[in-house]
Curated annotation (Swiss-Prot):
Keyword terms of this UniProt record: Cleavage on pair of basic residues, Disulfide bond, Secreted, Signal, Toxin
Summary of the function given for this chain in its UniProt record: Probable toxin.
Naturally occurring in which organism (per UniProt): Megalopyge opercularis
Tissue specificity statement from the Swiss-Prot or TrEMBL entry: Expressed by the venom apparatus.
Protein name: U-megalopygitoxin(9)-Mo13
Principal location: secreted
Disulfide bonding pattern of the chain: 33-40
Coiled coil: none
Gene Ontology CC terms, in alphabetical order: extracellular region
Signal sequence annotation: 1-23
GO MF annotation terms: toxin activity
Subcellular location: Secreted
Family of the protein in this entry: Belongs to the caterpillar 9 family.
Length: 50
């Protein structure tokens, strides 16, 4: 889970540098958040099955 959290922080940092235009920033952040959320959900489902 630490790796996912670290990836999220890096992605946010990258989004701030890369997506400087206001139109791109929310779209990029939304994609990152959804991607991170899906990964977290998968991890939680795997834990529940054990």
């Amino acid at each position: 889970m630490k790796l996912v959290f670290l990836f999220f922080i890096v992605a946010v940092m990258v989004s701030l540098f890369v997506g400087m235009t206001e139109a791109d920033k929310p779209r990029f952040l939304t994609t990152v958040c959804q991607d991170t959320y899906e990964k977290c959900k998968e991890q939680m489902l795997k834990k529940d099955k054990k």
